[in-house]
């Protein structure tokens, strides 16, 4: 059997094995894993002499591990496994050991031994640590732990045990954690003394002899210290041994592997300080360990001092020491801010804070960002503490300036690009992203400093910015771009303090002192020769700042022409990232400065002409946008076109400023429109033949037309914006845009992309054309709502129509009357189509709600007559039946509630004048639709009971109660229109037919006739809840 298992493992692991035979071998080994007796063969295979091959032994032990952890081995059998493995360990690692196992086998054995420890240490293997420690001697007579292979295995198991029961980062169930805690208690009772004694002996005897042993031992001390008596580690014997290992940091040249020992020794101190204890005890511990001296010595050691700013600088050690500084300062600050800590302790902590401030600054200002990042948590805690103190007592803010100022200067210095860094190189994208993330974290720290001492922050930033612009004035392009970028970045962040409600000004005056400072900076920036500074990073920053602080130009309009000139140069930037971003920023700038720009349209249109050429690029087949990096996406054809659209909007904004005469607006608009019209005409035939590039070109052309229209007018029907419709001649010019889009849509309405672009253009053209667009509405609907239109498309278009109805309610009746039936038939078709999957169900629910919103828009804007006109009479029953269906949908309460709202509005609109008081809140009576009062009673009233009588209806559900309230509102509306006729119907037919008793009927009818609309809406849900109880 053993040979069979060994052969199967060899075949399964051999790449050159015949596939069918290999598959059989895999199956055999997998069956072995689940066989209750398979582990016995594998244990024998592993411990055999002479040894089997490495792969056989590895897999065999894996099977034993799997069986033990899977519960296939009972306690008695585990004892057998323990005896077998212990004999093996003594033979291979003990006093007569030859060559030990390779690391992968050692790790696998350590894993097995750790499991056996968990299962048997409490009961069955009480001598666990004695047995392992016996491996550390070469002979029973040895007085020193002199067996290297045995010590390494012992430490391997020690570290594995910590991972199993002591590592707080490992997720455990409640039972697992309880077991881990009881095992730790047992170790502390039985063996902790001898374990820590063994560490001291190993560190003493092997301190210079074997770096692997020393490193493993230090890791064991560092990991176990978190859950053992601190006195077992923090004692003079152990500390002397740790200090000896720290001494390696003073060596100029370390042998290979020695730096790991040194770093592990520092980590032990970090773990000691990280141990949970009272604030007073922690402060005393920091003082007792003399950590200030330790950190000072390490900071001044050759790897961190003499080698700093050279290629020999030891970043690993710097990061390791930074962790020690970070955890120490966090505990110092915790002692300072905790309530209940004695005054004496706080005084000690304050002293330590002053002592550690140079250490914080040393590592916070380290040129390597990973080192700086390591101490950011403690800097954040310290600044947050200072902010808390300053809030309680503002006078203390000035006292803390000796701490704040050097930290702030370090923050600002770290925000500067490194001298070795470049900008925009594709190879440096990861570094750039990491640096920007660091800048964000530093920005948060800077905000805290500003909140502690605003004046200090303003002075520091003003000095950096002022000095940089002065250097720029004197040396021009010789200035390092990194310095200018830093000054501009600080200006951008400064707005967090200076800008209120999007502006630097309130009633024409600067918001505050920070705004005054920023206005001075803006003047210096715009008036300096920054435009001649050609580095892309600073050019981008310049544009971002101009846009962010555009309110500055409202009060310095004489500077606008120069800034516009700069932007017009930068929109042609050779670096794609800068160029495409500048298109967006240009649009933002001109939109915010629209009323101040003046008549520069001709200049702008001519300057941008070459950038307004549209060239669609079809994505290569198989390219997957999801797998594209953000940088790649920014440069993709789609992303570039989306950015290009901002230029079209910017042109529209500039050409329609108040200073440009209407005839000139038309002229400039046509200079942009005509090339697009020609392009659409050129590509239409190819697009009709489903040419992918031609279809995409027409999509892009229509999107550009719609975007240009948006630039010309912000006006939207029914909104309260101050914008107005453009001059009639401008609207007439854009009528051509509508016609050109419709021609393309009518020819290409099967294309989703073309429909999407056309819907976009339609929504933008409304603002330029106003009511001129209404006669074309049937054509728009015919093109946008086709047999292939998705529910999403229908819902989006319904939303647009709501706006059109609201804006043009006085002019739309006849058109709406003509198109309502065919339009609703398409919507009904979309609602009736079967759904496939959750996403489809969500889209269906959205379409239902937009359909109901559309009906409400029609009714609320006094256009309800169109639904019951002679032309639309045939579809009226379908309209009502869909609403009835929605009102009974127990799976969609939102739609059901809306359905009742529509029915109530119909009752108010067509039910005639009120004959019962207080129902429609003063709405003037309308002429009754003949027979509608009876229709409401027979069709609408029963719906109010349909949902609550559904078996699965829960009357306590919050959404269900909202639906019932709306249903109660409908009942009150019916009563207000029909009075006693409705009361009689309810008393004689509807309520008895539901099995309701006389007392309940009278209670219900009394409430209906007595309560107003609001009162009955509250009554009905409670009434239903009582009936359901």
Swiss-Prot record:
A GO molecular-function annotation: tRNA binding
Pfam families: Exportin-T, Xpo1
Subcellular location per the Swiss-Prot or TrEMBL entry: Nucleus; Cytoplasm
Keyword tRNA-binding belongs to the record: yes
GO biological process: tRNA processing; tRNA re-export from nucleus
Regions crossing the membrane: none
Reported function: tRNA nucleus export receptor which facilitates tRNA translocation across the nuclear pore complex. Involved in pre-tRNA splicing, probably by affecting the interaction of pre-tRNA with splicing endonuclease.
Family (UniProt): Belongs to the exportin family.
Name of the featured protein: Exportin-T
Organism whose genome encodes this protein: Aspergillus clavatus (strain ATCC 1007 / CBS 513.65 / DSM 816 / NCTC 3887 / NRRL 1 / QM 1276 / 107)
């Amino acid at each position: 059997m053993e040979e069979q298992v060994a052969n199967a493992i060899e075949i399964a692991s051999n790449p050159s094995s015949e596939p069918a035979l290999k598959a059989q071998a895999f199956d055999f080994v997998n069956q072995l894993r689940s066989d209750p007796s398979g582990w016995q063969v594998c244990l024998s295979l592993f411990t055999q002499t002479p040894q089997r091959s490495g792969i056989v032994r590895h897999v065999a032990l894996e099977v034993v591990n799997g069986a033990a952890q899977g519960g296939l081995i009972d306690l008695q059998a585990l004892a057998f496994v323990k005896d077998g493995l212990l004999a093996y360990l003594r033979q291979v690692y003990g006093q007569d050991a030859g060559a030990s196992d390779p690391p992968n086998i050692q790790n696998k054995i350590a894993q097995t031994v750790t499991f056996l420890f968990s299962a048997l240490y409490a009961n069955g293997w009480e001598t666990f640590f004695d047995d392992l420690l016996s491996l550390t001697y070469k002979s029973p007579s040895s007085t020193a732990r002199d067996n290297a292979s045995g010590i390494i295995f012992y430490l391997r198991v020690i570290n594995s045990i910590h991972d199993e029961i002591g590592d707080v980062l490992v997720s455990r169930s409640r039972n697992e954690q309880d077991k881990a805690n009881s095992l730790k208690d047992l170790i502390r009772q039985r063996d902790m003394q001898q374990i820590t004694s063994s560490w001291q002996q190993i560190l003493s005897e092997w301190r210079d002899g074997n770096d692997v042993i020393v490193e493993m031992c230090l890791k064991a001390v560092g990991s176990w210290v978190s859950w053992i008596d601190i006195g077992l580690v923090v004692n003079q014997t152990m500390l002397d041994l740790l200090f000896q290992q720290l001494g390696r940091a003073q060596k100029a040249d370390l042998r290979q592997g020695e730096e790991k020992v040194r770093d592990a020794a520092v980590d032990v101190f970090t773990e000691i300080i990280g141990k949970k204890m009272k604030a007073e005890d922690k402060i005393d511990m920091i003082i007792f360990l003399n950590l200030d001296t330790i950190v000072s010595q390490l900071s001044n050691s050759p790897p961190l001092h003499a080698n700093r700013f050279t290629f020999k600088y030891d970043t690993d050690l710097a990061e390791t020491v930074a962790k020690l500084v970070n955890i120490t300062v966090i505990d110092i600050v915790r002692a300072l801010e905790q309530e209940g800590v004695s005054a004496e302790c706080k005084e000690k902590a304050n002293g330590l804070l002053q002592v550690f401030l140079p250490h914080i600054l040393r590592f916070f200002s380290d040129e390597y960002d990973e080192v700086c990042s390591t101490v950011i948590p403690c800097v954040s805690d310290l600044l947050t503490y200072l902010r808390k103190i300053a809030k309680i007592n503002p006078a203390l803010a000035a006292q803390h300036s000796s701490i704040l100022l050097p930290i702030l200067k370090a923050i600002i210095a770290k925000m500067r690009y490194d001298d070795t860094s470049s900008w925009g190189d594709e190879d440096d994208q990861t570094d750039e992203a990491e640096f920007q993330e660091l800048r964000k974290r530093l920005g948060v720290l800077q905000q805290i400093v500003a909140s502690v001492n605003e004046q200090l922050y303003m002075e520091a930033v003003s000095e950096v910015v002022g000095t940089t612009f002065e250097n720029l004035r004197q040396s021009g392009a010789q200035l390092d771009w990194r310095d200018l970028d830093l000054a501009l970045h600080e200006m951008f962040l400064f707005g967090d303090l200076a800008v209120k409600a999007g502006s630097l000004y309130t009633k024409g005056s600067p918001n505050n002192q920070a705004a005054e400072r920023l206005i001075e900076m803006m003047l210096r920036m715009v008036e300096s020769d920054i435009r001649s500074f050609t580095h892309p990073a600073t050019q981008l920053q310049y544009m971002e700042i101009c846009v962010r602080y555009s309110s500055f130009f409202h009060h310095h309009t004489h500077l606008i022409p120069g800034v516009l000139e700069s932007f017009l140069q930068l929109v042609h930037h050779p670096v794609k990232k800068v160029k495409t971003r500048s298109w967006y920023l240009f649009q933002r700038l001109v939109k915010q400065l629209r009323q101040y720009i003046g008549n520069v349209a001709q200049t702008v249109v001519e300057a941008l002409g070459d950038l307004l050429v549209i060239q669609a690029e079809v994505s290569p087949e198989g390219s997957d946008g999801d797998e594209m990096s953000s940088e790649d996406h920014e440069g993709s054809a789609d992303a570039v076109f989306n950015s290009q659209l901002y230029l079209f909007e910017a042109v529209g904004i500039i050409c329609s400023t108040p200073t440009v005469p209407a005839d000139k607006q038309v002229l400039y608009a046509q200079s942009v429109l005509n090339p697009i019209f020609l392009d659409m005409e050129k590509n239409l035939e190819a697009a009709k033949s489903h040419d992918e590039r031609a279809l995409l070109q027409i999509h892009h052309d229509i999107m550009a037309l719609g975007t240009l229209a948006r630039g010309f007018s912000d006006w939207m029907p029914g909104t309260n914006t101050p914008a107005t419709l453009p001059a009639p001649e401008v609207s007439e010019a854009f009528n051509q845009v509508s016609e050109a889009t419709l021609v393309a849509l009518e020819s290409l309405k099967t294309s989703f992309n073309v429909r999407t672009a056309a819907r976009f253009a339609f929504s933008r053209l409304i603002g330029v054309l106003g009511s001129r667009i209404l006669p074309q509405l049937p054509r728009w609907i015919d093109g946008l709502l086709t047999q292939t239109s998705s529910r999403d498309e229908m819902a989006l278009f319904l939303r647009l129509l709501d706006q059109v109805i609201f804006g043009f309610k006085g002019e739309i009746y006849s058109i709406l009357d003509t198109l309502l039936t065919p339009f609703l038939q398409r919507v009904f078709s979309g609602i009736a189509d079967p759904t496939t999957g959750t996403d489809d169900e969500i889209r269906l629910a959205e379409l239902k709600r937009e359909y109901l919103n559309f009906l409400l828009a029609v009714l609320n804007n006094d256009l309800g007559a169109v639904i019951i006109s002679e032309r639309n009479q045939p579809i009226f029953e379908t309209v009502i039946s869909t609403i009835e269906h929605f009102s009974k949908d127990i799976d969609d309460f939102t739609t059901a509630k809306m359905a009742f709202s529509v029915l109530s509005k119909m009752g108010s609109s067509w039910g005639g004048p009120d004959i019962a008081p207080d129902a429609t809140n003063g709405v003037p009576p309308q002429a009754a639709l003949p027979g509608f009062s009876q229709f409401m009673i027979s069709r609408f009233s029963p719906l109010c009971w349909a949902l609550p009588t559904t078996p699965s209806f829960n009357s306590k559900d919050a959404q269900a109660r909202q639906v019932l309230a709306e249903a109660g509102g409908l009942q009150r509306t019916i009563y207000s229109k029909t009075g006693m006729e409705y009361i009689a119907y309810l008393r004689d037919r509807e309520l008895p037919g539901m099995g309701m008793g006389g007392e309940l009927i009278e209670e219900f009818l009394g409430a209906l006739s007595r309560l107003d609309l609001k009162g009955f809406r509250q009554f009905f849900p409670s009434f239903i809840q009582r009936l359901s109880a």
